[in-house]
Regions:
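Conserved redox-cofactor binding core of oxidoreductases
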Residues: 63, 70-73, 91, 127-239
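N-terminal Rossmann-like FAD-binding beta1-loop-alpha1 element of flavoenzymes
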Residues: 6-32
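A short acidic Gly-Thr/Ser loop motif
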Residues: 11-13, 103, 280-283
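Short, hydrophobic alpha-helix immediately C-terminal to the catalytic nucleophile
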Residues: 17-21, 221, 225, 286-290
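A short, basic/flexible loop-to-alpha-helix module at the beginning of a structural domain
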Residues: 1-4
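Redox-cofactor-proximal catalytic regions of oxidoreductases
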Residues: 52-150
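Glycine-rich loop(s) and the adjacent beta-strand/alpha-helix scaffold that form part
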Residues: 25, 29, 35-53, 214, ...
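FAD cofactor-binding and catalytic pocket of flavoenzymes
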Residues: 78-97, 105, 109, 127, ...
Length: 374
């Protein structure tokens, strides 16, 4: 007999994990399909999770750093390691980097949790949606992830106030961060809360290569695991390949057939669902819908699918700071800033530290490669 579920969630990042948690708490039968694996971190080990795949730390950056590489010029992605961490895609006018694993983008985000810059961002978009309504959700998430703004008492290295180049840079405030900050600054300690073991932030390795210590709050242990105690099912290494709308049948509530590749056993499988929540990220969600409609012929309609696709406005720049400080220490991304006298009211500049890179073996004078070389 074919497997059936009331709600199927595709993707376990911020969209999928939070939706799945809410539904599971309401007693709904929910299954999450995630193409990536559970990651090997202190919190996940403490929960007794099995089949953990490494983060791209140290030499693992070469074996588990990239999952696949794609381009609008290629007919097919180049898959390097299905347990790899990063998907890199070169598009026509946009480049996308996203993570793969249970918890989705929470493994590579900087831990910032901030409201939109535009005060009325949610107003006049839909009759049932407004800024006042969204504020309640912002407050709920900040409380759930125990996120708070940094203060001087946290003694974070390389804060903008400390590296403003004699006042040329102006800090624009401190957004809330979802990090386990040290109770004693400079002395990160082990903490266990609700059965989850974590280490406080060491200001050194919680960036885009993941947070092995669990200092950064990720969705696997903070959102999905608690929901699993209330009935949520999560299947890792299951990559959805197409979605098919079923013919209406009043005697059967199932409305969709979802086909996926189970990378754990190498089989193509499928499941019937009454409802499907597609939360596989901006790139993968659009790609899956296009494939389901145009290749698998499982969906119809959606005439504007793929049009107006864009990112969240990020541009990457590289400049030399000539600092006598180790700017990799501190938070993964510093608080937003602008030039002191800038008239601009919309652009934010953020200093990013690619922490953990010093543990990756690099070619050096020693010939075979020296760990820690830059």
């Amino acid at each position: 007999m074919q497997r059936k579920v009331e709600v199927l969630v595709i993707g376990s990042g911020f969209g999928g994990a939070i939706a799945a948690r809410r539904l599971a708490e309401a007693g709904v039968d929910v299954l999450v399909l995630e193409r990536g694996p559970w990651r090997d971190t202190v919190p996940n080990r403490s929960l007794g999770l099995q089949n953990l795949a490494p983060l791209p730390q140290g030499a693992r950056a070469y074996t588990h750093g990239l999952r696949n590489i794609g381009s609008h010029r290629l007919k097919k992605d180049l898959v390097l390691n299905r347990k790899g961490f990063i998907e890199a895609y070169q598009g026509d006018g946009i480049n996308v980097i996203c993570s793969s694993g249970v918890g989705g983008g929470s493994h590579v985000y900087a831990g910032f949790m901030d409201r939109p810059l535009v005060p009325d961002y949610w107003d006049n978009r839909h009759p049932d949606l407004c800024n006042a309504q969204m504020e309640g959700y912002y407050e709920e998430l900040l409380a759930t992830y125990k996120a708070r703004p940094l203060t001087d008492s946290d003694q974070v290295p390389n804060a903008i106030e400390q590296t403003s180049h004699d006042g040329k840079l102006r800090c624009l405030g401190h957004p809330a961060v979802a990090f386990l900050m040290p109770q004693v600054p400079g002395q990160p300690a082990r903490r266990v809360e609700d059965g989850v073991e974590r280490w406080e932030c060491d200001m050194a390795n919680n960036s885009f290569l993941g947070s092995p210590s669990g200092a950064k709050t990720t969705l696997d242990f903070s959102t999905l695991w608690p929901a699993m105690q209330k009935g949520l099912q999560v299947q890792a290494l299951c990559e959805v390949t197409s979605i098919h709308r079923l013919s209406p049948d009043r005697s059967a509530p199932m409305r969709y057939e979802v086909r996926y590749r189970n990378h754990a056993n190498g089989r193509d499988e499928c499941i019937l669902a009454e409802h499907v929540i597609l939360a596989a990220g901006g790139l993968s969600s659009v790609r899956l819908l296009l494939r389901s409609r145009d290749q698998a012929r499982g969906l119809t309609g959606m005439p504007r699918l793929g049009l107006g696709f864009g990112g969240n406005g990020d541009y990457f720049g590289l400049w030399k700071e000539n600092s006598d400080k180790d700017l990799s220490k501190g938070m993964p991304i510093g608080s937003p800033f602008r030039l002191k006298d800038s008239p601009n009211q919309s652009v934010l500049v953020l200093r990013a530290a690619i922490q953990g890179i010093d543990s990756v073996p690099m070619p050096g004078p020693c010939g075979a490669g020296c760990a820690g070389s830059r």
